Amino acid sequence: MLKRFYTAIVHRRRAVLAAFVLAAVLSVFASRAVQVDYDINDYLPPDSPSTIALEQMNSAFTGGIPNMRVMVRDVTVPEALDYKEKLAAIDGVEAVTWLDDSLDVTVPLQMQDTATVETYYKDNCALFTVTVEDANRLEAVAAIQDLIGEDNALAGTAVSTAVATNSTVTEVAKIAAIAVVYVLFILILTTDSWVEPLLVLAGLGAAILINNGTNLMFGTISFVTNAAGSILQLAVSLDYSVFLIHRFAECRAARPDASAEDCMVEALCKSTGSILSSGLTTVIGFLALVLMQFQIGPDLGLALAKGVVLSLVTVFTFMPALTLVCYPWMDKTHHKPLLPGFDKFGRFVSRIMLPAALALAVIMVPSYLASNNNEYYYGAAHMFGTNTRLGADTAAIEETFGKSDTWVVLVPEGDTATQAELSDALHAIPEVTGILSYVDNAGASIPPELVPPDTLKLLVSGGYTRMVLTVNADTEGDAAFALVEKVRATVQQYYPDAYDLAGQGVSTYDLMDTITADMVKVNLLAIGAVFLILLLMKRQLLLPVILVLSIETAIWINLAIPYFRGRHVFYIAYLIISTIQLGATVDYAILFSDRYQEFRETLDKKQAIAATVSTVTTSVITTGSALAVVGFLMGAISTNQLLGQLGNFLGVGGLVSLAIVLLALPGYLYLADPLIIKPKKQPKEA
């Protein structure tokens, strides 16, 4: 059946090539229609309290939660009021709040509440709280930047989303371009034809283009998927095409009288099992992300799994067709291997493998403990460092006015007496520096008919009363999360299970709840699924344990490094890398164990280790270094610190996995040999 399918592919190779070229071209246009979402809060589960609160508020009120802070330096009160009018006139700006919304600015400020005044006006600097609608976010942020100039500052989620949108597109293109150059370089070193690297890149390019185009089925993808999807697909799928072409060359060398078509069919039949098992473990590892409640997980997991599947389809259909068309050029451009052999390295590893295995065993438990005791960032507040305009602006605003966030409490309309009691209770919380509400601005005893309609619709609408809280707190951290719990508990006393609370800090609190709950579930599923596949492949228990534990230890070491360096970790990067590193690098361990078992049929175990290292090093270094390079490129080029950290994790993880597979895993296989090997021959030990 398999042979018949492959025979049909090679005989209809020009039709196959035409179909893939057409699919790739169509995918280029389709990928342009895929929307990218840069707002991390959009990926909260639909049943999270803050998501429900936002939906309730958006259905009842026309204006959203303030999502930008704008600071203008060296202005008088009249000048600040003029800036407020200009800000409000910008297309996409829904609302602007300043001091005049809380106090009568015609009265000398020295005679008014200092805390309230300094929330909005301090050291001749005016701080405006702005609400920008999502649909016109990019244009509004650009217009505000033009209005205030380089000497003033703006920050907030609307700004970070706009900056991420503008920067990621160019950064991803730069990363991809350099990654392709590196992959071409490493392929030139590790292949024996000048044309072969171009064929491999053509196959990878077709698979990546089609994967990007078929993302249209999702409608919208996350910024993480947009930034990491293609380069991850490039790194993890690189060896499939190389393996097939090498099998084809081996078959032609072994059967010089056979036709190229027959050799290709033979190569496909011989390589299908190895390539499929390698791809399947990677796909399963990525699919574990689908179980995350935090929706970036399913978004990235499905896109990556789809990408690997498409890469496999490409290898078994497009690559045979392309290779058969181009193999005469491969023959003409054949050259001697540019890399030296790894025989000496194999003998070196056979000498140091036991100390390496012991060293890994010693650091295994400390690495596991350290990797689980990092300090985390959960939201978007720290995505841009002070080396960026946004990071510098955020620091400048916080230096003058302190950390601040805006939350919204929704309670049922009416019963202004209870609302007044709630307002008093909220004012009593030290971190609450101001409240805009019906009872605070109009007064509990004032009937709605006497309140100006424009003011009333901002505070009371759709059966709800809205209380806008300004809190002196960061958007995440222990203090911010404790404040969320305190405010929720306070409102619960007056409106038991009949209120909603929304805001950036509140959403980040729910993010923390969601993604920490995902951690154990996703990791256990990924490890369990990969282990089960290995169990079915190897039909024994010990070898899958050794292989999975080796890669898991590499993951623990990778994630322990920030702990020992005293660095915070983005929990999303932590969660994603745990699954991706397993899926992307367990192939190295599988390949090594497969070749070791083959060599043990004719060699003693020490010779088999040396031969295995010598044989697999080129293949493992090709894919491992590609993963590391694209990761480090992402870390170096991305101004988004979440993406940058994810990239650095990929880079370090690829190198650590590479080192463990080539240096320590041989020692474990050597020690476990009597339990995992049943050789056909039992040669004497050298």
What does each model-found stretch correspond to?
Residues P46-M68, V72-A158, E375-Y376, H382-L543, ...:
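Structured non-transmembrane domains adjacent to transmembrane bundles in polytopic membrane proteins
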Residues M1-V36, A135-Y378, Q493-A686:
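Membrane-embedded transmembrane helical bundles of large multi-pass transporters/channels
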Residues I40, A380:
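Active-site oxyanion-binding pockets that recognize sulfate/phosphate
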Residues V36-Y38, D104-V105:
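Surface-exposed, low-hydrophobicity interaction/linker segments
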